């Protein structure tokens, strides 16, 4: 765990590998200042820690999916982002156990619909400059607009609701094509 100051926006917490392959959980304490005046500061920090630990564990248990985040192939990277972020957001969502969340609230239904539109466009994109922007938007920006994060999370929530732990295990077994699976 590395506590630092000065990591580039928008990253307040990230999981990264050092040149020697060691995984680091990096938390920028200056970026955390924006959470200091919030009443639910403890929940936010717990969510950040849970989220980044999920990335760490994915890297440990599924190194191929972890390495794919650095792939030069656009669709492979989009699959890896959606996989990684889907699990991390599912497990850390609102500091709430996944079976205590109303995954079909009107807000989340609207979010899923909007993010699926963005995911469809991202999957169809072939222009390299637009692909770069889609990859950025997939995981950066306003919470509910990070389309890979939201599509992954809500797809996995559905797997949980319909198939339980077996559904999550099946989803975890293969990140290939994961972005497209979230549209089903």
Residues of each region from the PLM?
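Extracytoplasmic/secreted proteins, especially bacterial periplasmic and envelope-associated proteins
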Residues: 44, 48, 83-90, 151-155, ...
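Catalytic glutamate of the conserved HExxH
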Residues: 48-60, 86
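Short pre-active-site segment immediately N-terminal to the catalytic Zn-binding motif
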Residues: 31-49
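Post-HExxH zinc-binding segment in Zn-dependent metallohydrolases
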Residues: 60-122
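Auxiliary, metal-adjacent structural segments of Zn-dependent hydrolase domains
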Residues: 1-26, 42
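Extended, well-ordered protein cores
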Residues: 21-30, 47, 74
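Pan-zinc metallopeptidase signature
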Residues: 103-184
